[in-house]
From Swiss-Prot:
This is TGF-beta-activated kinase 1 and MAP3K7-binding protein 2. It comes from Mus musculus (Mouse). Interacts with MAP3K7 and TRAF6. Identified in the TRIKA2 complex composed of MAP3K7, TAB1 and TAB2. Binds 'Lys-63'-linked polyubiquitin chains. Interacts with NCOR1 and HDAC3 to form a ternary complex. Interacts (via C-terminal) with NUMBL (via PTB domain). Interacts (via the C-terminus) with DYNC2I2 (via WD domains). Interacts with RBCK1. Interacts with TRIM5. Interacts with TRIM38 (via B30.2/SPRY domain), leading to its translocation to lysosomes and degradation. Interacts with ASB1; this interaction promotes TAB2 stability. There is a cross-link at residues 329, 562 (Glycyl lysine isopeptide (Lys-Gly) (interchain with G-Cter in SUMO)). Residues 97-130, 143-153, 162-171, 223-282, 334-366 have a biased composition (Polar residues).
């Protein structure tokens, strides 16, 4: 890799400049020449040098103008690294946290181990947490000799400074706004659940860099003495509008850093909006219960200004629902349709100190949230605009807010409000944020009103909008959005969704031009569980559509089966009807008896007719069948037979009878009984029928 002891490897120089942007280029080049372009050795040396330049202790008197011009542009990126989720694990690991997003190396991580870098395990995200130096200030936040005396105070990431004799070097590069959260905030329905900070300086013109969130936790040592963790003293949630990746804190803690197991550090995330210059950042701040102890904040007075920094463990919010949390957002002021802020109540029973601010160049307020505000001497020594959050207010403040819990910001005007440091920075009176629980409530909590926030800080250069909402869905009005606590509501609200919260805020004329920035912003989810919920919803919607298509197919199949069943039932009904009709055509028993008698009578008639036909054929044409029915009239007649009348027929028959008698042997058949009689008999021997009737 090295090209010689007298040459500089520009690739190594570029890597080191990105890893240590606060170190001047000439120092990095000199370090590379001394270490023969060895990356590990340069990282070890520059990690120590970076602390000096980061805290304003480096040598700024360079005779080389090219070095000075390079220094003005050296803060090009602040990078992050991920840390293990184990509370008591102190080493930097390569496992993914916060939604499996890889974080790059931080300026406070110390030495970068080349063989154990996360870049070998995961894809490196763009190391872009840019910062621009405003006009009239050098790269360390101090006014330049040629700059205007009334330039804007340089606000940013306060890291503290080591004690030196020079007051200008003691002045930190960034003027933070301190927000202290008192430990006695009551949890419940009226617990403040969201903190909106409205009012950030605009970005530098034509600046490709975005905003950053500088977060610094503080904690007091048990002995009362404070010290500064040099290379592990802070973490930054950085954001670049040109790269939509998100970077998460924290940096690698030192082995001496305390890890309160009950106080997990809140989760911080950033969001990439559609338009440049509309960057927002969100921090979820756990609120402690009344019984949970919380480490207070100490800001030591005097010239040392050293403080103990505690690096807490990150708790992955995606492991459960977001409960018991306060979300803080810092954004430009006077925005009608600002980006949406969603948060909920405290997630854990403990309080974690955190800081959230959004950087738009170097002029950004920094919010410090700790257990208690510093004393007056410490505030005078810092001489910076500060905001402290506590749960108590003065008696005068409580008189007007007895019916609603209020998170109140008041100004503590004192000697620090009028003091100026040697750098020309105007120190502003600190503002205190107090939480007012309601004085009167109906049993059962039905009459609990929504908590309010009052912000009064007349000397500050920035405008704050802080919204505190209870655990219930808010109403709708123009202003800053308060959270609703269902994940479905988080995803379904449109971009223009707003709430009805009485938000009292200060307007700053110096920041009025921020309104020219576009008002369109995306819905800020604020944590990885919302992204997971969004992906889950997409998956569930796709599954629902697939199931709906299957349901339609099943419905069609069911309709087809129903039609087939109806047709089969109709066929069965027709067959049954036909069968019933055929049964009805069969005659009954009485009808069959009648038909049988009719058939018998017809048979008798047929036989009679047949006999009559035979008789008619045998007797000739003069056969009279009616005379047969009268031959019984002569039976039993006594007396002589009357003589027949003499007529021609009788005369004709006489010779025939004579001829028959002459034959004596010709027998005759009786016409009635067909008995064969002797020819001499004139009557039938059986029926007495006359022979010639």
């Amino acid at each position: 890799m090295a090209q010689g002891s007298h040459q500089i490897d520009f690739q190594v120089l570029h890597d080191l400049r990105q890893k240590f942007p606060e170190v001047p280029e000439v120092v990095v080049s000199r370090c590379m020449l001394q270490n023969n372009n060895n990356l590990d050795a340069c990282c070890a040396v520059l990690s120590q040098e970076s602390t000096r330049y980061l805290y304003g202790e480096g040598d700024l008197n360079f005779s080389d103008e090219s070095g000075i011009s390079g220094l003005r542009n050296h803060m090009t990126s602040l990078n992050l690294d991920l840390q293990s989720q184990n509370v008591y694990h102190h080493g930097r690991e390569g496992s993914r946290v916060n939604g499996s997003r890889t974080l790059t190396h931080s300026v406070s991580d110390g030495q970068l181990h080349g063989g154990q870098s996360n870049n070998e395990l995961f894809q490196q995200e763009p190391q872009t947490a840019p910062a621009q130096v405003p006009q009239g200030f050098n790269v360390f936040g101090m006014p330049s000799t040629s700059g205007a005396s009334n330039s804007t105070p340089h606000l940013g990431f306060h890291l503290g400074s080591k004690g030196t004799s020079n007051l200008s070097q003691q002045t930190p590069r960034f003027n933070p706004i301190m927000v202290t959260l008192a430990p006695n905030i009551q949890t419940g329905r009226s617990t403040p659940t969201s903190l909106h900070i409205h009012g950030v300086p605009p970005p530098v013109l034509n600046s490709p860099q975005g905003n950053s969130i500088y977060i610094r936790p503080y904690i007091t040592t048990p002995s009362g003495t404070a010290r500064q963790t040099q290379q592990h003293s802070g973490w930054v949630s950085q954001f670049n509008p040109m790269n939509p990746q998100q970077a998460y804190q924290p940096s690698q803690p030192g082995p001496w850093t305390t890890y309160p197991a009950s106080n997990p550090l809140p989760h911080t995330s950033t969001q990439q909006p559609n338009q440049q210059g509309h960057q927002t950042s969100h921090v979820y701040m756990p609120i402690s219960s009344p019984t949970t102890p919380q480490p207070p904040t100490i800001h030591s007075s005097g010239s040392s200004q050293s403080s103990a920094h505690s690096q807490y463990n990150i708790q992955n919010i995606s492991t459960g629902p977001r409960k018991n949390q306060i979300e803080i957002k810092l954004e430009p002021p006077q925005r009608n349709s600002s980006s949406k802020l969603r948060s909920s109540g405290p997630r854990t029973a403990s309080t974690s100190s955190l800081v959230n601010s959004q950087t738009l160049n170097r002029n950004q307020p920094t919010v410090y949230i700790a257990a208690s505000p510093p004393n007056t001497d410490e505030m005078i020594s810092r001489s910076q605009p500060k905001v402290y959050i506590s749960a108590n207010a003065t008696a005068g403040d409580e008189q007007g807010m007895r019916n609603q819990p209020t998170l109140f910001i008041s100004t503590n005007s004192g000697p620090s409000a009028a003091s100026r440091n040697m750098s020309g920075q105007v120190s502003m009176g600190p503002a205190f944020i107090h939480h007012h629980p309601p004085k009167s409530r109906v049993l059962g909590g039905n009459s609990a009103t929504s908590p309010r926030v009052v912000v009064t800080q007349p000397n500050t250069k920035y405008t704050f909008k802080i919204t505190v909402s209870p655990n219930k869905p808010p109403a709708v009005s123009p202003g800053v959005v308060s959270p609703t606590f269902e994940l479905t509501n988080l995803l379904n609200h449109p971009d223009h969704y707003v709430e009805t919260e009485n938000i009292q805020h200060l307007t700053d004329p110096a920041l009025a031009h921020v309104d020219r920035i576009s008002e369109a912003r995306k819905l800020s989810m604020g944590s990885d569980d919302a992204a997971y919920t969004q992906a889950l919803l997409v998956h569930q919607k796709a599954r629902m559509e697939r199931l709906q298509r299957e349901l339609e197919m099943q419905k069609k199949k069911l309709d087809k089966l129903k039609s087939e069943v109806n047709e089969m039932e109709n066929n069965l009904t027709r067959r049954r009807l036909k069968r019933s009709n055929s049964i009805s055509q069969i005659p009954s028993l009485e009808e069959m008896q009648q038909l049988r008698s009719c058939n018998r009578q017809l048979q008798i008639d047929i036989d009679c007719l047949t006999k009559e036909i035979d008789l008619f054929q045998a007797r000739g044409p003069h056969f009279n069948p009616s005379a047969i029915h009268n031959f019984y009239d002569n039976i039993g007649f006594v007396g002589p037979v009357p003589p027949k009348p003499k007529d021609q027929r009788s005369t004709i028959k006489a010779p025939k009878t004579q001829d028959a008698e002459d034959e004596e042997g010709a027998q005759w058949n009786c016409t009635a009984c067909t008995f064969l009689n002797h020819p001499a008999l004139i009557r039938c021997e059986q029926c007495e029928m006359p022979r010639h009737f």
